[in-house]
Amino acid sequence: MTVATTVRKAVFPVAGLGTRFLPATKASPKEMLPVVDKPLIQYAVEEAYAAGIRHMIFVTGRSKRAIEDHFDTAYELEAELETAGKEALLALVRSVQPDDMDCAFVRQPRSLGLGHAVLCAEPLVGNEPFAVLLADDLMVGPQGGQPVLAQMVTAFRQQGRSVIAVQEVPEDQVHKYGIVAGEPAGGQLMRIERIVEKPKADVAPSRMGVAGRYILTPGVFDEIRNQPRGVGGEIQLTDGIARLMAHEAVYAFQYEGKRYDCGSKEGFLEATGELALQHPQVGATFRTYLKGLSL
């Protein structure tokens, strides 16, 4: 069967409750928490856009209206900025949703796991390959190089099969990740032979952890739909990918760049601090401030 190798659509599962960040997330989506001057979800959308993707699909839940509003046209705000002659701010606001990008939203009625969230997007994805980006994982590509998802799109075009971003994780963190093992397939690729969701360190097949970026072929939908519930009683995306491997190759991709685990407070603070230092407007001032601290 010929598999399309153009990735046109990206799925963003954003229905989670964000309990680690309470009370900040009591009424606001965790994906809208700002890292310097942009909400977390915007970094993921910009990464998808930079990879050539123009159709963004958000799988949402209750209390997520702010995400829809953020990626909508703010007519009143734009009019006020235009009247005030604030052209730079107006351009910044409009850049959130470029003219050639469209956004669609679908509800995940119950929190049944990441696999279920991806399955909720099937009617909008259709029978074509698609990307999945977890906003909790803020990915920064190498300086002067491609963003992480763009690297993966290149690998997918070469292989025509599902590609999953991976990184080596510390042994004491293995139980927090989907873990893969397999055989080298050239360059940064490994053909996956085993994938396990959140194993204990002593039984994990490796220390290569899945890093929140996927490019998947549409065959994964049937596998998710027909699988039993897995770890935590949830419908796991990892289990669907494991079932897909019985029918077609799936590759792990060791990306170039850095991942910030913004699902944790520590990772969120690391991202905020390091991206603030790189920010063209506040970086120098912030660096001076940090040097003056008595740590």
PLM feature segments, named:
Residues 1-6, 288-295:
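Basic/polar N-terminal segments that are highly enriched at the extreme N-terminus
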Residues 2-86, 144-150:
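N-terminal glycine-rich phosphate-binding loop and ensuing alpha1 helix
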Residues 9, 54-56, 102, 129, ...:
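Residues at the starts of beta-strands that form the adenosine-phosphate
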Residues 12, 58, 132, 164-165, ...:
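Structural beta-sheet core signal
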Residues 32, 103-105, 162-164, 250-252, ...:
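Conserved beta-strand scaffold positions in the cores of enzyme catalytic domains, especially
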Residues 40-43, 116-120, 240:
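Well-ordered alpha-helical segments embedded in enzymatic catalytic cores
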Residues 77-80, 87, 93-182, 216-218, ...:
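Conserved beta-loop-beta/alpha segment of the NTase-like Rossmann-fold superfamily
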Residues 131, 143-147, 153-157, 184-287:
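Catalytic-core segments of class I nucleotidyltransferases/pyrophosphorylases
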